[in-house]
């Protein structure tokens, strides 16, 4: 049990800890987020102790009742922290002793804060991953719904930020939705590796008192049990994986935000953000700034920093638990909060975005059909490399004459290749252009419909695979 100072350690120490060191060592300001998981883990462990004969039934019931009271105080906001509560485990155990007396001292039998904290963190992250998964799926669903509703809108596709080929607006939306679907799949995979029980590993060597880890696993609804006690208390792969997942997801969201910021400028005027997701200027009254998208873009860097910071912490550690690992929780909590906010804002932006179809259509230009002109010659039997060169000559001729590509006469085109004939006029139809890309994954209407169907099926499958995780007993 806690020493007279309220610490969970003591006996071999003399004197008091420097107040600056007290503050430096404390983590209660942020690991208090784990209060519910800490109570859940302690309740399961008390049942394990009772089964092992280390608690009587009456003692277990007393502890369980006390833990329920601790949880109630946290939930109602009445839990009072003590200056000596260096972390959530100290705080909860101290309060439990105040409520039920010395019996509380038996709860920590055979348990270390090393296996306790990593169990708490896994419980918290498992639940949080379910929440983030639901938010991410809602964003993808919103994007798919929008793509389905606006399938007939055409606009320029860009490579190197240069106009490339006509595509469907839906094709652009779906390109980002597909990337986010991979993020959704990765999150479920990360959660599976989070869902492994370390409790019962002790500080390093394991549990010598006959505690049934399979019972603990079932009580806390974990999918598996850790294989090695040294690894169980010190590995933070699951934290690094989560932070990397968030970094990659933010990469995708940042790229989408960058596209929309560009498309929303007066120079493009393809889209307009809702006032609900924009702000103004304190000096220039005409300004409508895409702050929602800019913050999504900037917060990507913040998340990357947390991921890199944790990896730098982990790479130099010797085996088993070290206090450095206290740094993992702040990173997890901050990134989780950031991801929750970003996903909700992104969903709001997409669902309320206004598109300017006319401007999108006006931005299409005949030079974007140069590739189609080459394909026209390919269909006439010309090898693609020759067709590419012939189309390039047509582009050069149009530029030299100061006219649009589709303004070249048939006679002028035939000076480049005799394969050009009257049906070349079909090349200059933007609708015809996009419809030729019928191969799966392309921008033709049939292919876009197929993509929408595939994404809806993936969302249904992921919803089945990732039901809301029930709280442990």
Curated annotation (Swiss-Prot):
Keywords: Acetylation, Amino-acid biosynthesis, Arginine biosynthesis, Lyase, Urea cycle
Amino-acid positions noted as binding 2-(N(omega)-L-arginino)succinate in the UniProt annotation, renumbered to this chain: 27, 114, 159, 289, 321, 326, 329
Pathways per UniProt: Amino-acid biosynthesis; L-arginine biosynthesis; L-arginine from L-ornithine and carbamoyl phosphate: step 3/3; Nitrogen metabolism; urea cycle; L-arginine and fumarate from (N(omega)-L-arginino)succinate: step 1/1
GO cellular-component term (any): cytosol
A biological-process GO annotation: L-arginine biosynthetic process
Database matches in SUPFAM superfamilies: L-aspartase-like (SSF48557)
Active site: 160 (proton acceptor), 281 (proton donor)
N-acetylalanine found at: 2
UniProt EC number: 4.3.2.1
Chain positions found as N6-acetyllysine: 7, 69, 288
UniProt-recorded Gene Ontology molecular function terms: argininosuccinate lyase activity
Catalyzed reactions: 2-(N(omega)-L-arginino)succinate = fumarate + L-arginine
Site for Increases basicity of active site His, residues: 294
Record entry for activity regulation: Enzyme activity is regulated by acetylation.
Pfam families on file: ASL_C2 (PF14698), Lyase_1 (PF00206)
Modification note: Acetylation modifies enzyme activity in response to alterations of extracellular nutrient availability. Acetylation increased with trichostin A (TSA) or with nicotinamide (NAM). Glucose increases acetylation by about a factor of 3 with decreasing enzyme activity. Acetylation on Lys-288 is decreased on the addition of extra amino acids resulting in activation of enzyme activity.
Matches recorded under InterPro entries: Arg_succ_lyase_C, Argininosuccinate_lyase, Fumarase/histidase_N, Fumarate_lyase_CS, Fumarate_lyase_fam, Fumarate_lyase_N, L-Aspartase-like
Family to which the UniProt record says this protein belongs: Belongs to the lyase 1 family. Argininosuccinate lyase subfamily.
Record text on subunit structure and interactions: Homotetramer. Forms tissue-specific complexes with ASS1, SLC7A1, HSP90AA1 and nitric oxide synthase NOS1, NOS2 or NOS3; the complex maintenance is independent of ASL catalytic function.
Described function: Catalyzes the reversible cleavage of L-argininosuccinate to fumarate and L-arginine, an intermediate step reaction in the urea cycle mostly providing for hepatic nitrogen detoxification into excretable urea as well as de novo L-arginine synthesis in nonhepatic tissues. Essential regulator of intracellular and extracellular L-arginine pools.
Record's protein name: Argininosuccinate lyase
Species: Bos taurus
GN (gene name): ASL
